[in-house]
Amino acid sequence: MTQKEAINELKSEDSIHPRRLLELSKRIHGNSAKKQIAVDMLERYTGHDIKKFQKQIILTNFHFYVEQFNEAFDDSYHTKGSAFQASSSKKAKVTIVEFGVGSAMAALIGELISVVHPKAVLFLGLCGAVHRSLKVGDFILPIAAIRAEGVSNHFLPAQVPALPTFKVQKFVSQILVEHNYDYRTGTIHSTDFRFWEFDHRFKDNLIDERVLAVEMECAALFTTCFVSKVNIGALLLVSDCPMQKDGIKTKKSASEVFRKYTSLHIELGIQAMQEIATRGEKIRHYTW
């Protein structure tokens, strides 16, 4: 049944289906007009031809990661568009996209990347530690994200959890274990509140939630990718410890993080995506 036929069938039934009609119109995989605009936007924002995108995609907030990717592969095809930048390696079968910072941009790239029909997507993000046991340089594999960033409410009801794709997280965890790197798993808090470090009520709420860390993109990425039928995981790097005295990231400490830890972060992400590319194992997405 085509999308048009499905919509006409719903229109002919009773009035309990307007939400279903809205869902059909919103989702890229069920809306050819939206998909055409999304392809155009993805190419325009990244400067990347849609045919150059590989089926394994890494998402990042920072241009340093793209630079590291370009240095790793001599066949990298690197472009800068009007908003993002991207680089692809046919040899590695991986594309990396820098999409900016925040939940709105995360939701946008989550939808746009669905037109590539990737096998797997991995977000390499930075986060601020909440739990006292975490320190700068630690890795977190989130099992869920608290949806406090707002934009995900446009895609799913508030009671639906924001979850990564288990199998993507499994591949990443295997890479970490094989290289003898420790990591933590747990829930993270995704917020749109940038200077939360100075709000004591916000910080008290984080303790009540029992979250490991705070960041800005995971909930939006997990939600939009789920709705868009994209398999996504995340590997987060602790970049500061804002709950501790003098623990907030500064220009100086941020440069230290990039110098010491991000090369390993991108290396692990690339290896995980290459592992997914070379294995014939299919990553199934829940359908409804």
What are these regions (language model features)?
Residues 1-122, 128-288:
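Accessory terminal and edge-of-domain segments that mediate assembly/interaction
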